[in-house]
Amino acid sequence: MIFMMGLFFSSCREEKSDPGYLAGIAAKGYYDLLLEGKYKEFVDGYNQPYRLPNSYQDQLLMNAKMFVEQQQDEHKGMVKVNVLNAKADTTHHVADVFLQVVYGDSTKEQIVVPMVEVKDAWKMK
């Protein structure tokens, strides 16, 4: 009986989400936006602690669009993105997310997306 009560109370405590998992979900979400052609939303996923000049914002948007076009030319586009792994350093509020990009020509590429936690949200570095 006491054992059962211990199990009950241990299952009631609040579970804290794994920071690496959360960073991985965020990184995949940003790259999914890129696949959908939502370049502004993708660029908004970068940690920008200070307001950037409009000309720099425009350049980041152009770079994102050119990157997608280049992948279309070289690999028949990006088809999907998968999270392979994520390692978080909770002391420094950073994480490295390992993504797999699957291309239209059936090739796959692994990339690392460095992330930083800012006000309880994961942003790309």
Regions found by a protein language model. Name each.
Residues M1-I2, L99-V101, M115:
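Short beta-strand element of the conserved SAM-dependent methyltransferase core
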Residues M1-S10:
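Sec-dependent bacterial lipoprotein signal peptides
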Residues S10-E36:
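Short, low-complexity N-terminal intrinsically disordered segments enriched in polar/charged residues
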Residues A23-A27, K38, F42, L60-A64:
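Stable alpha-helical elements in mature extracytoplasmic
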Residues E36-R51:
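Short, well-ordered alpha-helical segments enriched in acidic and aromatic residues
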Residues P53-D58:
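Boundary/linker segments of alpha-helical solenoid repeat arrays
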Residues L61-K108:
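Surface-exposed, charged secondary-structure patches
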Residues K108-K125:
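Short beta-strand edge/turn micro-motifs at domain boundaries
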